Amino acid sequence: MKKTNIVGAQNVEVSIKLPSEKTPQEQLAIMEEYTRVHKESKGLSKEKREINCLKVIYPTLFRSIEEQDLLAGRLDFLPIGFGCVTSLGGVGHYCVFDKLLKFREELSLVEDQKRVDEMYSYWEENDVKALYCKDVLTEDTVGRFIDCDFPLMATARLSGMMLDYPKLLDNGIEGLKTLIKEKQVVLGDNEFFTASIESLELYQQVVDFERELVQKAMLQVSPERRKQLEMMDNDLEVVRSQKPRTFHQALQMV
C-alpha cells in the first residue's frame, strides 16, 4: 500500500466558485458542527450517519436569490461537507484539504486556526477519497488524482451517484415516499428506507427555505421581475409535494 499524500489539488474545478455568502466564522461553525455530527454518528448505520450530516448543511448552505436568477437553488460548498461529484465539494463525506488550509489563512485568531487544525487531523482519517486512496494506491502503477507520474489515476472517474431523473419527475416527492412505504410493507423496514424518507422530508424543508428566499427577493423589484419570482415561488410550491407539470417546474425540481 502506498502512503497517501493528501496535500495538493484533489478535484477538477469545472467552474469558478463564488465566495461563500457566509462569514469565515459562520463557515467555521458549520464545518465544526458537520465534523462533530459525523464523529458522534460513528456507531450508527451509514444511512443514519449520512442523513444526520446532511441536516447540518441543508438548507443552511443555500444562497440568496440573485437578480438574474430564473431558478432557485444556488448553493455554497465548504471545504468540509457531503457531495456526489468531485467537481462540487467531493464524493461522500469529504474534506478538500488544500481549500481547508486556504480557509485557515483567512482566520486571524490563533484559537480559530487551531480549530481548523483539529478538523484537518480528523478528516485525514475520515475523508472518503483519502480512505479510498489508502486502499488502492500502489508504489508504481496507481497514483492519486492528479499525479501524471503514474499510468493510472485511481480517482479520475470517482463519483458518487446519478439521479434516476424519470422516477423523480414521474412521481414527485410524495410519490417517491409512497413507493418507499410500499417497499417497507413488502420487505420490512430498514435503515435505508427510513433515511430515504428523511431525505425527502429534508428536500421539502429546503423548498420551504428557498420559498422564503424568493419571497424576500420580491421586495422592491420591477413588475417584470416580480412575475419571474412569483412563477419561481409557485413552482417551488408545486414540486414540494407534487410531480412537475411544466418544464420550468421540472428544472426547478432537479
Describe the residue ranges of each PLM region.
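Structured, charged N-terminal subsegments at the starts of enzyme catalytic cores
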Residues: N171-V254
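Long, non-catalytic protein-protein interaction scaffolds
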Residues: M1-E182
